[in-house]
Amino acid sequence: MNSPIDPAIVMPDVQSSADTRHIQIQRVGIRGVRHPMLVVAGDGSAQATVANWTLTVALPAEEKGTHMSRFVALLEKYRATPMTPALFSQMAREMLPLLHAERGDLTAAFPYFINKSAPVSGVQSLLDYEVIWTARAAGDEVEFELRVQVPVTSLCPCSKAISEYGAHNQRSHVTVSAVMEGDVAMDAIIRLVEDEGSCELWGLLKRPDEKYVTERAYDNPKFVEDLVRDVAARLKAHPSVARFCVEAENFESIHNHSAYAVVEG
């Protein structure tokens, strides 16, 4: 059995000792941390989710190690605080003096839900989106990046043009990575992407809704190239987007492979 620690004894802090190899570490910290998170949703409510966190800082060449426990302490401090992109960026800024670091990155990947009304019946249901927030802090400056994967329907223009009836269509994932400046309206970015698919998706549809989405997609055919170009054009015009990358993957219903395209801007 371990003996109780005598408070008069000074325990050695090995990780704070000097390192003689003189090699800087660009990123060191913790990752794969599942931790509760409150996110301020588009309607202003606090949405409870579970995020997969990565917290890292740069370590100077002369220092042996960083203070790993302080990353978890930072998560605990904000566990009950509803998060906005601005507060998330502040959390990354706060991490630097806590770890005695000049640079650091904070990443949270989490499922996010939006309550949607079906297009005809109006029946409501949740739809989930995969979201990643990243804040890169250097001194007093913080760069915030939003990454969101939005599922949509795509219908092939060529298939429609050559067929007497019908056209092959499929579910597609459009992933936007955007460095944001100023106000960040995550729901608005999701809505922007959904508007550019052949049709958006819903969690629950009645028969009149199914008729609508079938005909909506048929009237709005798009190649994977159309998807990324149309979303990119909208992002270029967005006042809060500094730079972006748009990826689209169509899970082809007539092939055992996907169609894929990327636009960076």
UniProtKB/Swiss-Prot annotation:
Keyword annotations of the record: Hydrolase
EC number(s) per entry: 3.5.4.16
Record site feature (May be catalytically important), residues: C156
Keyword Hydrolase: yes
Gene Ontology biological process: tetrahydrofolate biosynthetic process
Coiled coil: none
Keyword Membrane included in the entry's annotation: no
Pathway(s) annotated for this protein in UniProt: Cofactor biosynthesis; 7,8-dihydroneopterin triphosphate biosynthesis; 7,8-dihydroneopterin triphosphate from GTP: step 1/1
Known catalytic reactions: GTP + H2O = 7,8-dihydroneopterin 3'-triphosphate + formate + H(+)
Pfam families per record: GCHY-1
Entry GO MF terms: GTP cyclohydrolase I activity
InterPro entries reported for this sequence: GTP_cyclohydrolase_FolE2, GTP_cyclohydrolase_FolE2/MptA
Function of the protein: Converts GTP to 7,8-dihydroneopterin triphosphate.
NCBIfam families: PRK13674.1-1
Protein family (similarity comment): Belongs to the GTP cyclohydrolase IV family.
Protein name: GTP cyclohydrolase FolE2
Organism: Bordetella avium (strain 197N)
